[in-house]
Amino acid sequence: MTVQGRILQAAFWFLLIVGLTACSGGSSPIKIKGNIATSHDVNPDHAGRPSPVVVRVYQLRAPGPFLNADFFDLYDSANATLGQNLIIWEEFEFQPGETIEYNTKFDSDTKYVGVIAAYQDLENAHWRELVTLPDKKKVHLNIKLDSLTVSVSTGKR
């Protein structure tokens, strides 16, 4: 092969690699490591007995619609309520005293994490929490469900 042929071949491979890299999509996902934990007295029923609780975790681009919506709008029609601000949501059901490791990947467009808990006593519960994700590719995220309060933190335990 001539020198000119080798240069053309090298240029071809270089352009092919650059082109494939450019087509590979957006930014890499955000790695989430943490846990979701419920207290032993979570979600008391009318007699004060702890009960299972449903939790939703929302990946969001902006906080406004999440903060302004009521529980049933978020629970029954999240896509319509949150519109383009919603990236995706996940749902879990927990027994009192249950803890799981929450290791996942969030979309790189996620700027906020919203969490709601379907407490039986919504009127007296702090059922919604929102945190801003740090601008990092690895985030430690803890979600805690107490009797009538959901809390979220992005620091170490």
How would you name each of these model-derived features?
Residues 69-106:
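Tryptophan-paired
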Residues 1-12:
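Bacterial N-terminal signal peptides that target proteins for export
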Residues 24-27:
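Bacterial signal peptide processing site
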Residues 47-56:
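Short coil-to-beta strand junction motifs in C2/discoidin
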Residues 110-120:
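A short, solvent-exposed beta-strand micro-motif common in secreted/extracellular proteins
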Residues 39-41, 129-157:
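Extracellular beta-sheet/turn segments enriched in Thr/Pro/Gly and aliphatic residues
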Residues 19-22:
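C-terminal motif of bacterial Sec signal peptides marking the signal peptidase cleavage site
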Residues 35-47:
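Short amphipathic, basic-aromatic surface patches that mediate peripheral association
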